[in-house]
């Protein structure tokens, strides 16, 4: 099995990060290979889901999540497009979240499965972490055709333009503002 803790510690030390590593997935992420929670500064790795995978794949998902941690904790290291997108999470099923402070607000995008998957993997911060994870695993374990195949599974078939994301972000923001206007109206009305 891949030595998660060893590479986690090395990455954190090399990037001056103070993070936690957990193998217990948070609620709602039980079927994910990993996630990073920017509120608790915790990298979650689903060892149970990854236990039968090759070591290069286990490493890929650890480095993927560690790169997310660096994006959130050191945004000055990344370009404006990545930084703009960090407040928005678009999942492969069209479920979206906007982070405001330490809270997440939910939104849903409708579309066919292929479009939504492409929308998810085309996000600037996702493309950045997947490219980083691929290069880091090549550096640590060497190149393999299987690793290259894994990486290409996470490359969008057709890249979605950043302007499209900006329009989606505006729609998410608008929906959140409308929701809070209605809540404030309802609370004021019921008093």
Predicted regions: what is each one?
Residues 65-84:
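Catalytic Zn2+-binding segment of zinc metalloproteases
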Residues 25, 47-49, 67:
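Short, flexible loop/turn elements at secondary-structure junctions
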Residues 167-191:
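A hydrophobic membrane-anchoring alpha-helix module
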Residues 44-62:
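Short pre-active-site segment immediately N-terminal to the catalytic Zn-binding motif
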Residues 2, 56-60, 64, 123, ...:
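A structural signal for well-ordered alpha-helical segments within the folded catalytic domains
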Residues 18-44, 53:
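Catalytic zinc-binding patch centered on the HExxH motif and its immediate surroundings
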Residues 84-175:
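Metalloprotease/metallohydrolase-associated module, dominated by Zn2+-dependent proteases
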Residues 1-16:
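Zn2+-dependent metallopeptidase catalytic core
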